[in-house]
Amino acid sequence: MAGWSCLVTGAGGFLGQRIVRLLVEEKEVQEIRALDKVFRPELREEFSKLQSKVKLTVLEGDILDEQFLKRACQGASAVIHTASIIDVTNLFNPQVTMNVNVEGTQLLLEACSQASVPIFIYTSSVAVAGPNSYREIIQNGHEEAHLETKWSSPYPYSKKLAEKAVLAANGLPLKNGGTLYTCALRPMFIYGEGSPTLYYLMHEGLNNNGILTHNCKFSRANPVYVGNIAWAHIMALRALRDPKKAPSIQGQFYYISDDTPPQSYDDLTYTLSKKWGFCLDSRMRLPIFLKYWLAFLLEIVSFLLSPIYKYRPPFDRHLVTWQNSVFTFSYKKAQRDMGYEPLFSWEEAKKRTTEWIDALVEPHQEALKTKTL
């Protein structure tokens, strides 16, 4: 399939832009279409420089705009759908999250059907699998266990519904008589340079005398570096374009991790930032079970006030569970079916992320030294 093209939604985001950079290096790619609601000027400039390697078309528009999606998909050979509202703290209006994550995915699938795009790769989330209880322990989980979140919180629920829609669409007929083939990737918590979460935590730490929040002491996860999850999308695309590998991939979901050591989310943040004197908050915290039931009470208050006031609790039971669970997964199935191997080692991922944090923190170096003395 010489001269193929690929549409990447969410291409202005943390993960999407990394996928675009890798796609540029793929053989025989004729065009990359980068779609997002808005692109930062510096990213637009970077993408324009990539034009020397391949045709790169920037498309600004709404994932809920049906006509826009149909135009974006016209003539494309594959779609990588990363566009999503990622919101575990419920900052967004729940209906907006559901609309973007579920309806947006359904509209894009329909656009692929009408434009006869044969390959659709969806960026799902480990959140679609749980954890459902902070007492639940999943270590080296795998796809055959068919774990599924029971939470109705907008983010995990919307991602679950969207993934189901994508996998159910596998095998559907296209307008030109062809067939749509789909798969979904479930990344762990994604870290790396440009991470919105790390950016927020670093600035919060700078404003808090070099002290990092310590909410996830009892968690154990295996975070994945952004360069490796981006690479997994490339491997999935190659596999779905390969007649020998494609039958094993079609309609499947895959957990994507790498060789980052299992650790708590707090420990990861500390490891990446400790050279600047950041430290974890040592103050006593509420026991998990008390925080869980406090979250339940806050959810009840939010529900009771909803007719007259939109109160959004600072945390809910899903977030408390997420922050305090043992929940790790293996990437062996992706390794077996699509040949995925992490492109970056833990040491390289740590080095790259730390250098990015250095650039964030360095302008505040003197103030940070004073605060941490």
Curated annotation (Swiss-Prot):
Pathway linked to the protein: Lipid metabolism; steroid biosynthesis
Coiled coil: none
Keywords: Endoplasmic reticulum, Isomerase, Membrane, Mitochondrion, Multifunctional enzyme, NAD, Oxidoreductase, Steroidogenesis, Transmembrane, Transmembrane helix
SUPFAM superfamilies the UniProt entry points to: NAD(P)-binding Rossmann-fold domains
InterPro entries per record: 3Beta_OHSteriod_DH/Estase, Lipid_A_modif_metabolic_enz, NAD(P)-bd_dom_sf
Residue numbers binding NAD(+): 159
Entry GO CC: cytoplasm; endoplasmic reticulum membrane; intracellular membrane-bounded organelle; mitochondrial membrane
Active site: 155
Its membrane topology: Single-pass membrane protein
Residues in the signal sequence: none
MF terms (GO), sorted A to Z: 3-beta-hydroxy-Delta5-steroid dehydrogenase (NAD+) activity; oxidoreductase activity, acting on the CH-OH group of donors, NAD or NADP as acceptor; steroid Delta-isomerase activity
Record field: transmembrane: 288-308
Reactions catalysed: a 3beta-hydroxy-Delta(5)-steroid + NAD(+) = a 3-oxo-Delta(5)-steroid + NADH + H(+); a 3-oxo-Delta(5)-steroid = a 3-oxo-Delta(4)-steroid
EC number annotated for this UniProt entry: 1.1.1.145, 5.3.3.1
Predominant place of localization: endoplasmic reticulum
Superkingdom in the source lineage: Eukaryota
Location of the protein in the cell: Endoplasmic reticulum membrane; Mitochondrion membrane
Function, in words: 3-beta-HSD is a bifunctional enzyme, that catalyzes the oxidative conversion of Delta(5)-ene-3-beta-hydroxy steroid, and the oxidative conversion of ketosteroids. The 3-beta-HSD enzymatic system plays a crucial role in the biosynthesis of all classes of hormonal steroids.
Family: Belongs to the 3-beta-HSD family.
The protein, known as: 3 beta-hydroxysteroid dehydrogenase/Delta 5-->4-isomerase
Lineage: Eukaryota, Metazoa, Chordata, Craniata, Vertebrata
Encoding gene, per UniProt annotation: HSD3B
